[in-house]
Amino acid sequence: MGKSTLLNALTGEKVAIVTAKPQTTRNRILGVVEVAARKGKRQDARPAAQIVFVDTPGVHKPGSQLDRRMLQEVYEALETRDVVLVLVDASRRVKLGDREQGTGDREQGTEGQRDGEEEGEPSDRLRQDDRREKRAKGPSWASEDEFLFGLVRKLDCPVFLVLTKIDLVPKDQLLPMIDALMKQHEFAEVIPVSARKKDGLDRLLARIVEKLPEGERYFPKDQYTDQPTRFMVAELIRERILVDTGEEVPYAAAVVIERFEEPPAEVERPRKKGAPQKLPLTRIAAAIYCEREGQKAILIGKGGSKLKEIGTGARKQIESLLGTRVYLELHVIVEPGWRDSKRFVEELDWRRELERLAGEGKTD
């Protein structure tokens, strides 16, 4: 479990996409959690609070323009924080303990960050891009840890160490793990959690509330994220690409929503008794960008089979999000070197796009 999984568990909603691949998260994602007041003895009581969590991309040394933009997302999130959580996958740290003398799998960013590791062996045709991915993710655990803790040491706010997947780790191995990490930084709190079993989540929320300043509510009670629907739809499509393709293809893919037609408001007509209700239809067209013709061939698959698989999986998730039927049209475009194009990378940032539209006096 990484930060995206934790965010989804805390909000009770699918705010962020989650996969087993590193560097899944590319943008800052806000998740809003309402914490109810608790009465009782002084040590047990707490005020009502609204916690705004910011899920950031992974902290790693940048290798491309996309990497630099992702790291900028981290810096911008740190400018407005009251508390910072550094997540460590305890189960993976145990598995890697005999392989490398580092500080293990730590996250203040992407899900399951495993620098320089990918699933499977790349083919000769894709080996060059695979090497590029490994360079972008960093040369070693030690150097990445040094980079991460270098950022953390500059912060003037409470920093929590959150150990995840503790249900998969023997208890006698947790304390040595915590001791080793405490040597890297003096954390304000150390909180082991398991999202799968809901262990430690309430304690984590309580400790965060203790550190937060009093202030006005940022979001309405029923709002759990700040993401526009179009961005969430694009992310669900990208999630299927991450799940359904391998090697370097997911990292070279970007999704742009080209058309989003919501169903018109209809007057409810009487239905025959026992007839199922027909949900309205949302029409969506999206472009999947990649960098090479070989990647395009993989994304499309033989006879379009892979693109159909991606579309079918994404459509089900989008229908769950929107509460409507969805007609989803996908096509693939080759944009050589888009990850090193500042213009292209910035156009993928929905916050910048909203600022541009506001400056032109337009609305979404």
Regions found by a protein language model. Name each.
Residues 1-81, 88:
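Conserved G1/Walker A P-loop phosphate-binding module
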Residues 2, 167-169, 173, 177, ...:
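Conserved GTPase G-domain signal focused on the G5
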Residues 25, 59-61, 94, 169-170, ...:
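Catalytic P-loop NTPase motifs of RecA-like helicase/translocase cores
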Residues 37-41, 46-47, 69-107, 112-190:
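Conserved C-terminal guanine-recognition region of P-loop GTPase G domains, centered on the G4
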Residues 55, 164, 194:
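Active-site glycine-centered loops adjacent to acidic/histidine catalytic or metal-binding residues
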Residues 138-142, 171, 194, 198, ...:
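Conserved phosphate/pyrophosphate-binding and hydrolysis machinery centered on Walker-type P-loop NTPases
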Residues 188-189, 202, 212-220, 243, ...:
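Short, structured loop/turn "capping" segments at alpha-beta junctions
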Residues 229-364:
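P-loop NTP-binding site
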